[in-house]
């Protein structure tokens, strides 16, 4: 019987780049309100998998389901309407615009990078309700004092928080995050994951790729390990996750990296 808490699942996802099989029958399940982490060496297929899930790549075989609806190969902008949003390893703020404007721009072309919003200067919404919502999100992220700062003047970690803020403007059910603390100082990295836990408590689900296990392990509920385009290990809960990370085959691929 399928887990009634499941919000996302993939079934036997296959993705080719030419003759190279980047994903080889990948099946995962993500429960509602969980923080699920995918790890693996570079080139193991992690980014390809989340690109398929979020519509930035098309699967060659297999299906993706969200809340039991088939969302396979839908465009990112379509997935916004299902409540799925994505943050990127390299933040993509509009650097000439303020922090506040960057949050408001997400309401124009939801599900797309703001860099694709050709008419953003003309169409930035100024309705009081949207501005109030943006300020509440900035306060939550401890960025309200920077609301009028140009995004190009922010630190890398602050830009990552702006990415999260833009995602929150869409009232997401699930946020898919690609290395949210890459290159971020440890203190701010913990701040970011503390925000993740606060959002989890509000019912938001997270699917995350991240290499910095020393920081993230205390924040996750579910772990998948990928290698050569396949899931090679899985653990749910603290004890199972510890067992996975001490598994000789998992240790070997990380030592070999």
Curated annotation (Swiss-Prot):
It comes from the Archaea. GO terms for molecular function: ATP binding; ATP hydrolysis activity. ATP binds at residues 40-47. GO terms for biological process: amino acid transport. InterPro entries: AAA+_ATPase (IPR003593), ABC_AA/LPS_Transport (IPR051120), ABC_transporter-like_ATP-bd (IPR003439), ABC_transporter-like_CS (IPR017871), P-loop_NTPase (IPR027417). Transmembrane segments: none annotated. The keyword Transmembrane helix does not apply. PROSITE patterns: ABC_TRANSPORTER_1, ABC_TRANSPORTER_2. One of its GO terms (cellular component) is plasma membrane. Residues 8-253 form the ABC transporter domain. Keywords: Amino-acid transport, ATP-binding, Nucleotide-binding, Transport. Monomer. Belongs to the ABC transporter superfamily. PANTHER family: BRANCHED-CHAIN AMINO ACID TRANSPORT ATP-BINDING PROTEIN LIVG-RELATED (PTHR45772:SF5), CONSERVED COMPONENT OF ABC TRANSPORTER FOR NATURAL AMINO ACIDS-RELATED (PTHR45772). Probable component of a branched-chain amino-acid transport system. This is Probable branched-chain amino acid transport ATP-binding protein LivG. It comes from Methanocaldococcus jannaschii (strain ATCC 43067 / DSM 2661 / JAL-1 / JCM 10045 / NBRC 100440) (Methanococcus jannaschii).
């Amino acid at each position: 019987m399928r887990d009634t808490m499941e919000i996302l699942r993939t079934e036997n996802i296959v993705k080719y780049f030419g003759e190279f099989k980047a994903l080889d029958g990948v099946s995962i399940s993500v429960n509602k309100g969980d923080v699920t982490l995918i790890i693996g060496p570079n080139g193991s297929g992690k980014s390809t998998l989340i690109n398929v899930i979020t519509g930035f790549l098309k699967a060659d075989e297999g299906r993706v389901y969200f809340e039991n609806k088939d969302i396979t190969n839908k465009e990112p902008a379509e997935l916004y309407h299902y409540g799925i949003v994505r943050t990127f390893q390299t933040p993509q703020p509009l650097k000439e615009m303020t922090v506040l404007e960057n949050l408001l721009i997400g309401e124009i072309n939801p599900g797309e990078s703001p860099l694709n919003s050709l008419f953003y200067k003309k169409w930035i919404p100024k309705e009081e309700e949207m501005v109030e919502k943006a300020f509440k999100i900035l306060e939550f992220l401890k960025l309200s004092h920077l609301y009028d700062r140009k995004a190009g003047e922010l630190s890398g970690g602050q830009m990552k928080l702006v990415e999260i803020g833009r995602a929150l403007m869409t009232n997401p059910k699930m946020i898919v995050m690609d290395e949210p603390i890459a290159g971020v100082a440890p203190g701010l990295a913990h701040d970011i994951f503390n925000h993740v836990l606060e959002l989890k408590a509000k019912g938001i689900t997270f699917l995350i790729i991240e290499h910095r296990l020393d920081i993230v392990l205390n924040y996750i509920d579910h772990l998948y390990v990928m290698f050569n385009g396949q899931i090679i290990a899985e653990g749910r809960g603290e004890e199972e996750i510890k067992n996975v990370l001490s598994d000789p085959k998992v240790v070997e691929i990380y030592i070999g990296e």
